[in-house]
Amino acid sequence: MELCVISTTTTVKAINPFLPSITRRVSSRLFQSDSVLQFGGRLKKPISRPLDMSCVSRKIGFFGDFMSHGGNFRLFAAASPAVETSVKEDKLPADLKVTETVQANSSVKLSVEVPEIVCEDCYQRVLTEFMKLSKVPGFRPKTRVPENIIVGFVGRQYVLRATVESILKRTLPHAMESVTGRALKDSIQIVSSFPDMEKAYSKLKTLSYEVVVDVVPELKWNPEDGYKNMKVVVELGDEIDAKKACERQLRQKYKSLGALKIVTERGLQVGDLAVVDISATTIDEDGSTGQAIPDAESKGFHFDTEEGNRLLPGFLDAIIGIRAGESKSFTLVFPESWKQESLRGQRAQFTVDCKELFYRDLPTLDDSLADKLLPGCTTLKEVEETLAKRCQEMEQEAKEQATDNAILEQIRKMVEVEIPQSLFEEQGRQFYGARLLEIQGNMKLNEDQLASLSSQKAVNEFLETQRESITNIIKQNIAVGDIFKRENLEFSTDELVKEVENSISEFKKHKQEFDEERVKDQVQEILEGAKVLEWLKDRAEIQYITR
C-alpha cells in the first residue's frame, strides 16, 4: 500500500549489480531519481562529421519510416540498388538549396531543394545499377540496355521509387552538413511523405523534402557560474542514523525468531501483527465524501505495529484496540511533507477491516541466540558490534548519497535548457527498460504480462506520467557535463580502462550481453560525474539538518 510507508525518507538508490565498485557508487548518485531508475545511460552524442551513405541507411531508418507511407516499399527497399559513397567523394553536379528553421525543443527543420540536374544524375545511376543487376532477354549481362527497355523490364513505378530513394540517400548527407557537430545521432527524421515525393518527382523531375533533426541543446546558467559557490542544505532522516538503524536491524532479526500466535482475548496493541483491508476516500471542504484514494487501498495488508512511526501520522493510534472481525472508520489529514504532492493537507476518511490478529512469542534474548541472529557470532555484544559497524558504513553512504542528490537538484534548478524530444524518448525508454528488468527480477511474469508491459502503449504511458522526472534527470546530466567541460576537469586513461575492464568482466560473469563501446561511454560519463561532484563539494557550503 503506497500510503503505508514513511512519508519523508532519505533516498538510497538501487544499484546496478553489473557495474564495478566505483561505477556503482557514482552511478547510483548521478543517474537515478525517486521515480525512475537509470543504469548510467549515455546522453546522445552530436554527429561530428558529415553522414556518409551507409550511416544514413543505418541510422536514419529510411525503410521503416517510408514503409508506413509507401505501400509495397518493403520489397523495393530490399532489392533496390544503393550508391554508398562518402560526402567528400560524391560531389554533386549542382549545389542543394537548404533552408534552416529553428524549432522548439532544440530541433532544426531543414527544407531541402534538389536541382533537376542532381535528380537526373541519380536517375541515370539507378538505371545503370539495374542494368548490372537485371537479366534482360536479348541483352548480355551488364551491357547497356536502352532506357525504355530497362524501365519497362523493371517497372516504371519501381524505377521511380528507386530514384527517389537514391536522391534521398545521396543528398541527405550533403543537406546535413549545416548541422554537423550539432545534430544528435539517431534524431534525424524525414517528415515529408514518400508518396508525395514520388508524385512531385514524377511531374517536375525535381525533388524537395523536409528533415527535422535534434541538435545539442544550448545551456544557460542562472545565475551565471552559480554552481561555483553553492550553499546546500541536506536533509537527513533519522532512519539513516547508525545507532537507530542498528537497533532496528537487531529488533527485526530478533522478531524473526519468534513464532506468530493468534490473539483471542484482546484487541490490537503495539507489538502485534495485523492482517487488514484498508480503503480511503477524500473529504471535500463541505464535509462531503469525495473520491477514492487508490494508492491507499490494500487487501490483506500485513501491518506490523512496531513500524507504526513509518505510517501516516495518527493511523496506528486510530486502530489500537481493534479486534479480529471488527471494522473502524476514522479521519486523518495528510501532512504537508507527504511524498505525494496531490495529497498534502488533504483530509481523508479511512476504513480498516481487521481480518486476523497475531502476537509474537519471542525467545529469551541472550548469547544463545547470537549465531541465529548473525551467523558466526557467539555473543550478543559481538552481534551488536558487527551490526553497528555495518550501519555506520551505511549511514556514511546514505549521507553521501543525500549530499549528491541535494547538489544535483540545486544545479538542475540553475540551468535553463530545452530538452530535445529524441533525447527525452531515448532516456525515458532506458529508464523504462530498467524498471521492467527490476519488475522481472522481483516477480515471475507470464508471457501475456510481459507482452503487456513491453507494449508501445505501456512505454508511452510511462513517458507521459514520468515526464517531469525524466526531464529533471536529463537536465542534471547536461549540467554535469557542462561543468566538466567548463572547468576543464579530467580523469586518467588508466581510470577509464580499469573501470571499463571491471564492468565488462562483471557483465561476462553474469552472462549479460553488452556493447563494449556503450560500456565505455557509460563509464566515461560516470567518471565525469564523479569528478564534477567532487569538485562541487569541495567548493560548496554544505549544511546538514535532521528531520
Swiss-Prot record:
<dbReference type="GO" id="GO:0009941">
    <property type="term" value="C:chloroplast envelope"/>
</dbReference>
<dbReference type="GO" id="GO:0003755">
    <property type="term" value="F:peptidyl-prolyl cis-trans isomerase activity"/>
</dbReference>
<keyword id="KW-0007">Acetylation</keyword>
<dbReference type="GO" id="GO:0009507">
    <property type="term" value="C:chloroplast"/>
</dbReference>
<dbReference type="InterPro" id="IPR027304">
    <property type="entry name" value="Trigger_fact/SurA_dom_sf"/>
</dbReference>
<dbReference type="GO" id="GO:0009536">
    <property type="term" value="C:plastid"/>
</dbReference>
<dbReference type="GO" id="GO:0003729">
    <property type="term" value="F:mRNA binding"/>
</dbReference>
<keyword id="KW-0697">Rotamase</keyword>
<dbReference type="Pfam" id="PF05698">
    <property type="entry name" value="Trigger_C"/>
</dbReference>
<feature type="domain" description="PPIase FKBP-type">
    <location>
        <begin position="271"/>
        <end position="366"/>
    </location>
</feature>
<keyword id="KW-0150">Chloroplast</keyword>
<comment type="function">
    <text>Involved in protein export. Acts as a chaperone by maintaining the newly synthesized protein in an open conformation. Functions as a peptidyl-prolyl cis-trans isomerase.</text>
</comment>
<dbReference type="GO" id="GO:0015031">
    <property type="term" value="P:protein transport"/>
</dbReference>
<dbReference type="InterPro" id="IPR001179">
    <property type="entry name" value="PPIase_FKBP_dom"/>
</dbReference>
<keyword id="KW-0413">Isomerase</keyword>
<dbReference type="InterPro" id="IPR008880">
    <property type="entry name" value="Trigger_fac_C"/>
</dbReference>
<dbReference type="InterPro" id="IPR005215">
    <property type="entry name" value="Trig_fac"/>
</dbReference>
<keyword id="KW-0143">Chaperone</keyword>
<dbReference type="InterPro" id="IPR046357">
    <property type="entry name" value="PPIase_dom_sf"/>
</dbReference>
<dbReference type="GO" id="GO:0006457">
    <property type="term" value="P:protein folding"/>
</dbReference>
<comment type="similarity">
    <text>Belongs to the FKBP-type PPIase family. Tig subfamily.</text>
</comment>
<feature type="transit peptide" description="Chloroplast">
    <location>
        <begin position="1"/>
        <end position="77"/>
    </location>
</feature>
<keyword id="KW-0934">Plastid</keyword>
<keyword id="KW-0809">Transit peptide</keyword>
<dbReference type="InterPro" id="IPR037041">
    <property type="entry name" value="Trigger_fac_C_sf"/>
</dbReference>
<protein>
    <recommendedName>
        <fullName>Trigger factor-like protein TIG, Chloroplastic</fullName>
        <ecNumber>5.2.1.8</ecNumber>
    </recommendedName>
</protein>
<dbReference type="InterPro" id="IPR036611">
    <property type="entry name" value="Trigger_fac_ribosome-bd_sf"/>
</dbReference>
<dbReference type="Pfam" id="PF05697">
    <property type="entry name" value="Trigger_N"/>
</dbReference>
<dbReference type="InterPro" id="IPR008881">
    <property type="entry name" value="Trigger_fac_ribosome-bd_bac"/>
</dbReference>
<feature type="modified residue" description="N-acetylalanine">
    <location>
        <position position="78"/>
    </location>
</feature>
<dbReference type="GO" id="GO:0009570">
    <property type="term" value="C:chloroplast stroma"/>
</dbReference>
